[in-house]
Amino acid sequence: MKLLITGFDPFGGEKTNPAIEAVKRLPAAIAGATVVPLEIPTVFGTCAEVVRQAIITERPDVVLSVGQAGGRSALTPERIAINLDDGRIPDNAGFQPVDQPIQPNGPAAYFTQLPVKAMAQAIRQAGLPSHVSTTAGTYVCNHIMYQVQHLRATEFPQLQAGFIHIPFLPEQVVQRSGVPSLSLTDDVRGLTAAIRAIVIAHAD
């Protein structure tokens, strides 16, 4: 079994993004499955093409995308992606769509194929906060989740895909009083637990 794990580059003026930093530190194999890390740009459209090319090259069984959700206090596997781009800030290419469909002829939403409740439980069993989320937002995180699901629907039917949000790192909240954070070590531990849950479910 092979998993493609994607993480976004820094955006919104941040110097770091816990998503790619955690993804880069994942073990090469988890529960006997191969883990392939991939950095993707925080850019509408382009991020999906980068992932598509990686799917063609790597032929993964699962794509799990990881993104930063500043303000959240837990690792949150996402249940659903909606067909809407509505950027609160411009992406890293300066593009800021407002109320635009991601795929004009696509469905209103896609549900993940990943075992989100088992993932959240595994993260909690690792001693970290986690719960299933029903909103991936309307920025590039939701965009990539939707786009990978659309790729599954149109090109790669055997693929399973999903998304998980992780909190800010401690160094990102130094000037943000009261905003929660999680250490990079804990991010890696939580993601590893979530991936193990995916592998176990895939084997059943």
Curated annotation (Swiss-Prot):
The active site is at 78, 141, 165. The keyword Protease applies. GO terms for cellular component: cytosol. It catalyses: Release of an N-terminal pyroglutamyl group from a polypeptide, the second amino acid generally not being Pro. Its EC number is 3.4.19.3. Keywords: Cytoplasm, Hydrolase, Protease, Thiol protease. CDD domains: Peptidase_C15. It is found in: Cytoplasm. One of its GO terms (biological process) is proteolysis. One of its GO terms (molecular function) is pyroglutamyl-peptidase activity. Its main location: cytoplasm. Removes 5-oxoproline from various penultimate amino acid residues except L-proline. Homotetramer. Belongs to the peptidase C15 family. HAMAP family: Pyrrolid_peptidase (MF_00417). This is Pyrrolidone-carboxylate peptidase. It comes from Levilactobacillus brevis (strain ATCC 367 / BCRC 12310 / CIP 105137 / JCM 1170 / LMG 11437 / NCIMB 947 / NCTC 947). The gene is pcp.
